[in-house]
Amino acid sequence: MVTRLRLVSRSSRYATVKFTDSVSACSCRRLFSASTDPEPESQPEQAPPTNPVTGDEKLRNLRVLLQQNRIETARGVLSSLLRSDSTPFASPKELFSAFSLSSPSLKHDFSYLLLSVLLNESKMISEAADLFFALRNEGIYPSSDSLTLLLDHLVKTKQFRVTINVFLNILESDFRPSKFMYGKAIQAAVKLSDVGKGLELFNRMKHDRIYPSVFIYNVLIDGLCKGKRMNDAEQLFDEMLARRLLPSLITYNTLIDGYCKAGNPEKSFKVRERMKADHIEPSLITFNTLLKGLFKAGMVEDAENVLKEMKDLGFVPDAFTFSILFDGYSSNEKAEAALGVYETAVDSGVKMNAYTCSILLNALCKEGKIEKAEEILGREMAKGLVPNEVIYNTMIDGYCRKGDLVGARMKIEAMEKQGMKPDHLAYNCLIRRFCELGEMENAEKEVNKMKLKGVSPSVETYNILIGGYGRKYEFDKCFDILKEMEDNGTMPNVVSYGTLINCLCKGSKLLEAQIVKRDMEDRGVSPKVRIYNMLIDGCCSKGKIEDAFRFSKEMLKKGIELNLVTYNTLIDGLSMTGKLSEAEDLLLEISRKGLKPDVFTYNSLISGYGFAGNVQRCIALYEEMKRSGIKPTLKTYHLLISLCTKEGIELTERLFGEMSLKPDLLVYNGVLHCYAVHGDMEKAFNLQKQMIEKSIGLDKTTYNSLILGQLKVGKLCEVRSLIDEMNAREMEPEADTYNIIVKGHCEVKDYMSAYVWYREMQEKGFLLDVCIGNELVSGLKEEWRSKEAEIVISEMNGRMLGDVTVDEDLSATEKL
């Protein structure tokens, strides 16, 4: 029969100990109530000598104290023994074993006392767990309070694996764990990211009719939210309500955070509304979580509404709130708004810490506002802020982004003057910028500088260099860097190989890219989906669709799921090669895999069908996009408007009117070209006027369309004024413009005017299109302008553009 004993009393700070030696029940009761029944001596009891010579003497002293029922003295001696550096026992477990051998009749009493001291006075939690397992092997079982305390301390000291093992050991006995014990075990499982184990224990406790607490539900909901299992988290929330448990503020905050991180801020709002209905007052954490999620989703206006509600309810933003606002406005490219928040914080007397300040500085640096960043940093330093490495690195990166490498170096010097040693992150900013500029020699000089300063290049440093040389297609240097990394003991990672593979694919070196992939696999670095996507994209861009699908099959064979980027790349490759039926099959497969097509998916299909001349299918795909809630991009409208020109003005105008985006030059030119092709020059010139009013810069394509339209409606004399306007805008006409003009005159059979324009074109060194040249020569000969025709033929042949063919009848006439 397992011995059980209450070790830690709820009403006393002392352990309750059951003695098996000849100690009276009266004495025991006195000992267990030491706080209310003091020992009879008026003077504090003196412990035996504290420096016995041997371990045996220490054990004998403890045995005597226990036999004399002097529990508190024994506790003090035991606590000192455990803390002593000169203790003869390697561990508490060894101490227990030694005591058990010397005093077997007291081993139960001693075990309880030892466990109590380990948990309470000494806080030796790992040793307490080891002792627990040793006691179990001896058939000794601690009390419920002892186990509760042990599990609680194990969780607090983050010994989650041990917590689970102790609890499973408890389950294996005939001991009935308490609700608190289950809670600690479930908490440990969730902390280990093993929500499955937590749910298993959760179901076990319900089976044993131990009803979970709000704490346990909160722990599991938190674990499910962190794993983005929001449906399961919702089910647990509903179960709480069904059991008439009132969700706490923590419950609601956890769900709000989960939905935000899962990219579903709309659901977060619903949880917030549920809080209001249940009269649960929000906390600052509630609002901070909502703000972070909304900014992440790009819902800036909604975030600002939440901020207003927060202030209306009397909440004062803290440093973390300001960090969220700075980061949120930054990620949504609203640095000016971030500056406004900063001024509000200053006016409110909020003191910026280094973390919050670094986020604001990063926002400004990303948008190239390095001068403003310096101004704010100066203001904060005047208030006592001491810049740390993060702030300096942020500023160095800001200078590098703007191309001010002198300013970046000055910041490095400022770091050194402040006693900080710039690390690889600081130097990487400079190295990256030189690589972006293609100045690899300067990049290498920076690497040498950091080495001289005692800073070893990091994997990221080498990866930056690989990318720099790769973009210049200097692949031999890339391989040299890989070798240098290995020689220095810096193992290339997935990014190292991925950077090189990507550059090789962009440089049409597909064979070499595959060799690098095999090399990384041989070195134990497994390619991820991103690397496979690079290879697939490289194959598709070269029209090697079969090779692309070979890689996709290899992915599946290795258990790597195809993601949306993979499918989009394959669909784009199929669409470019006219294999539209196969592309549509992949579109269906995307949905079957639980993925959602995006705008890139549809743009590829629209482009493919457009190239095939199937405008109706393009429009159908566009309508399907809208029904699915996918917002078209400017590229979508570029494709559709250029394709719909032949379909007429009405369809083009409908597409133009449906745009929720600000039209760019390509869109305006597409619509204007449609008007010109269909001869509606009034609308064409009105649109040109609108472009000028909206500061949309006109280009040669704009004027080419206007010239084409004027020629279409027979206003040949107006063409010269458009050419003059182009010249006034320093937009000198080139070959394409002159070809349009010559062809336009030929189409209305004004061949001599066409010839005049040809002469101007020729004098400026531009070449006439061969087909247009044939048309011009034929027309000139029809009008008996053989001399001009011969000049055109001679000049075009002289330009090595091939012979200009004319009808045999015209040739015969020429001979006459």
UniProtKB/Swiss-Prot annotation:
A Gene Ontology term for the protein's cellular component: mitochondrion
Subcellular location: Mitochondrion
Targeting signal (transit peptide) range: 1-39
GO molecular function: zinc ion binding
Pfam families listed in its UniProt record: PPR (PF01535), PPR_1 (PF12854), PPR_2 (PF13041)
KW Mitochondrion (keyword) present: yes
PPR repeats: 108-142, 143-177, 178-212, 213-247, 248-282, 283-317, 318-352, 353-387, 388-422, 423-457, 458-492, 493-527, 528-562, 563-597, 598-632, 633-662, 664-698, 699-733, 734-768, 769-803
InterPro entries tied to this protein: Pentatricopeptide_rpt, PPR/CCM1_RNA-binding, TPR-like_helical_dom_sf
Stretches for region Disordered: 34-57
Keyword entries, A-Z: Mitochondrion, Repeat, Transit peptide
Similarity comment: family membership: Belongs to the PPR family. P subfamily.
Protein name, UniProt field: Pentatricopeptide repeat-containing protein At5g12100, mitochondrial
Protein's organism: Arabidopsis thaliana (Mouse-ear cress)
Lineage of origin: Eukaryota, Viridiplantae, Streptophyta, Embryophyta, Tracheophyta
